[in-house]
Structures are given as structure tokens and as C-alpha cells.
Amino acid sequence: MALTHIESAADPRLETFRFVGDAAELERRGLVVVEGRLVVERLLADSTLQVHALLLTAAAARAMGVVLARVPASVEVFVVPQPWMQGITGFNLHRGSIAIARRPPAVSVEELLAGGARRLLVLEGVGNPDNVGGLLRTGRAFGVDGVVLGPGCGDPLYRKAIRVSCGAALVVPFAHDPDWPRALGVIRHHGIELVALSPNPSLPSIDDVAARRAPSRGVALLLGAEGPGLTDAALDAADVKARVPIDAASDSLNVTVAAAVALHVFR
């Protein structure tokens, strides 16, 4: 793999990097943007996404030498001076490393489950990219096999979501399915217990629900957006509803924290 040192910020070979802040244009071209050295390294080392090109500072290229040595020759690796980066990309959160990759084909819930997924996070209405990214990171930390995103959910491959996920969005399988609550029925049809999480104090605690479930059965934890929570349709589609027990002085948890607690209990 050869590094291409760019001598002019106007070099036409950098054209693709000039719209990395334009989500609509990225979607139109079927591309995703990965920023930050550690996340770019995860893309190169662990992800199945097809990498198109890299834009690095000289310092980042030196730091990533071992990983870059394994990059296929078909991937263009451009090196530019640090002061040029913001002018080329339009933002300054990249820490000297940006990658552009091809967006993978969409995966259905059926395809996700056909791959053997038995431990899932299922999201409804979670649109905030910080929460989407945080949930992907949490899911990877607790070994989920996949994430199902229903109506109103944000894109796990949105630039900020990838960054917040620390690259987990690049390796954890996920499926978007707007056909709701049909998708929830598909999950249950595969023998996976669907557990809906709600702050309703009248519900049994996740500890009690986890203690009663069959260890051999898969589990899908269903979470809604902060504030509105799950819709009645989603709650009605679940096998069981449960709450994360918290102090009576508090009304709820951040959705990422709730997911982490529940995944630990249902480990």
C-alpha cells in the first residue's frame, strides 16, 4: 500500500472528502464517513465495510503504520498537512484521520435472524445519534448478536453515531424495519423472548423476569426513545414487560444506561 502525499488542497482527487459533512449527499452516493484514528483503525481491522479512501495527516499516517500496511492496494490513502484538513472536510473533529467506505446493502430482520442472532437490542423511535451510537457501543460490549431499528430510529452509519459508538456501528449487525409491529412478531416467531423495558413502577423488575426465563431461549430487549418511551403497539407485542428498578426520586434512566443494566441482568 502506497501513501499519496497531496501537494495542493485543491487537488481534484480529494473531491469525495469535500462533502463528508453533507449527510444527504453521502446517502445519495451510498457512502459513509468514519472519523478519528481509533475508529478508522477499527474500520480497517474489524469491519466488513468496503473502504473507498482515507485522508490522513502525516502524524496520523505514522501512528497507523501497522494497520495501514494491511490496507489493500485498491484503497487510496491521501496524506495532507494538518492545517488543510478542516478546509477540505468542513469540520475539525477528525483528529487527523477520515475514511470513506461504501454503505452496505440493507439487511432485513429475517436476514439478521437467519444468521443465528439470539441476543438482540430492539429500538423504537430512538432518533438521537448520540443514543443510537451509545446503544451500539453498549450492545457490542455486552455481546449482542444484532440490533433491530424500528420506525423513527436514527441511522447507525450516520457520522456522529459511528463516532459515539467508538466504531461498534461498523461491526455489530443491524437491520432497519419500518413494518412495525410486524417485525416484533418475526422476532418472537424465531423463539426469541421479547422483553419490553418501561419505567412503569407497576411492572416486575428485570431481575425477576430474568430469573424466570428459560436459559436456552434467546432474548430481545425492546427500548423506546427517552421521553415518550415505547408505543402501546410495541408494548402489546412483547412477551413480557419489565422495569429497571431505580430510586423512587428518579423517574427514568438514559436509554443507553437502561440498556446496559438490562443486558447485564440478561447476560
Can you name each region flagged by the protein language model?
Residues 1-67, 153-154:
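Boundary-proximal intrinsically disordered activation/regulatory segments immediately upstream
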Residues 195-250:
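Active-site/ligand-binding-proximal alpha/beta "capping" segment
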Residues 97-99, 138-142, 153-169, 232-267:
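Structured adenosyl-cofactor binding patch, chiefly the S-adenosyl-L-methionine
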Residues 69-97:
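Glycine/small-residue-rich loop that forms an oxyanion/phosphate-binding "nest" at active or ligand-binding sites
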Residues 62-74, 234:
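Short, aromatic/basic amphipathic alpha-helical patches
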Residues 36, 127-134, 252-258:
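Amphipathic alpha-helical repeat scaffolds
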